[in-house]
Structure formats: C-alpha cells, structure tokens
Amino acid sequence: MASKPIVKWNTFVSAHQQFNERAHRYAYGKRGREGPFALSEAVRESLQDRSSLSLKATNARARIEFCRAARRIMRRIVKPTLDRPAYFLTLSPINFVTSAAEAETYDWSMLQKWAEEQLKGFCYFGIVDAAPYANTPRGREKVVSWHIHAIVWNASRDEMQALKDSINKRHQSLLPNRDAAHFRVRSSWKGLRQSLTYMLKAPLKTYRVYPIKDSNKRPTGEYRQKKDWHRSGEAAAVCRFMHGAEIDKLCVAGLEGREILKDVAARSVATIREQDATRVRALIRAVG
C-alpha cells in the first residue's frame, strides 16, 4: 500500500487491518515468541479480536469502531461553516519526545495535563498520538514524539492564532524548522471528517528525518521528514510502547467535547457488543 494520508474511511480500515496482520505476523513468529525481542502474552492479547471491548489502543477492531462512532457523533454536533469554522490542531513540543526505550514506560498523562492547560476554555476533542522516528536531527537515535491532535470549535481564528503563537514562543518542535503548534481551518464537514479520521488512527507509520541542503549541497540547518508504513518489527515496537493504553483514556476533551468523548466511547463499545451477539446468533443457527 502506498503511504497516503489516512483521511478516507476505506484507507483507515485497510491500514488498520494491515497493521494488525503485520503485528500478528511478528507476535506469533519466532522473534515475537522467543528471545530478547519477544512480545509479552499481555501485548499479544491486546491484538486479539476479543480485546476490542476494552478499546485497546493497538486493537484494529477497537480503532475502527471508535472512529466510526466519532464520525457519526461529531457530524451531529459540530457543523463548521466559512463563518464559523472548526480547526484541526496539532501540539508537538520537544518536551514530550522520549527515546524508544523510554517510550515503553512513558506516562502520557503528563502530555494530556499540559494540553488541557493550553486549551482551557476551548471546546475540543482530541487524542494522544505517537510518532516513532528512526532517526533525529542529532543522528541515528530512535525516538518517539508524543503529541496531541485535536478538533477545536466555537473559537475564532484570532483566538486560535493567539493560542498557536503563545505555544510556539515557549516551546520548540523536534525539527528546528517546524512549529510545536499548528492548525488547519476546517470550514466544511468533509474537511473536518478527514481530520477526525486522521486524528483517530493508531501510530501506523515510522518517520525518517533528512537534512535540507542548499544548491551547493551544504546543510541549511533545516530538515524534512518522510513517513512510511511500519515493517513488522516497527509494528511490534508500537505494540510494546502502546501496551496498556485504551483509546478513550488517550483522549482529551474540553467543554462540549467531554460529552462527545463519553458518547463516542459508549457507542463504540455498544457496537462491538452488538456485533459479537450477532456472530453468536449466526453460529448457533449454523450448528443448529
């Protein structure tokens, strides 16, 4: 699959299914079961279909149903227009970058608390995400950039710009030529739906950093990044550092967003229960 932005529903579903296949292939292969890079039984269990009811962050079915519920509920409540748009906000200060080893025990509630302080008084619904980097501007060190994606509404462009400027004055990003805070204006449901879909994906890609050079092939001090789908070992690393996380517990929300989060979590769990009951009834009919 080409590395396209995950903003369409079919792409979202297929990307999570492929992540699930890669993670399973590693988890139940020799490397995943034996030796220093083996996955624990608890990590493997999180990948199983039966773990979807717990909304495990690495569970493909849970991600799909959580996103499906969010798209339906947000469409009913958040109605962006040209005059009253919504915003897709990303917060990625370097303060919340950890080494790959530290990521396995990282307490992302620190990032959540920080984001909640920045967004006090705003209507928003967002989530903690993780971007694994195979290298950094400093060299071949593997790190994980923990960050927040959020949908913000009932705010003016001036308020959003002031928020962005305030954060960028106080915080740097992993890449020196990138802002720690940035946002995109969403004035239609189509654009907002795409941002919401992107926001709720699992960490599905690995990033690599490259120096930007001038016409004389000398480094400019700026960097660009590329991302591509995880290899099996990279997918396994995500399973390790996201182990124990539940999708709804990774979320952040303010004002009207709190009720949205509550409804999305409840609806996604209810849908999974209904699907399981339907499967059982079909099985009973088949053997009866």
Language-model region placement:
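Acceptor-substrate binding/catalytic loop of class I
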Residues: 147
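Right-hand nucleic-acid polymerase module
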Residues: 1-144, 154-288
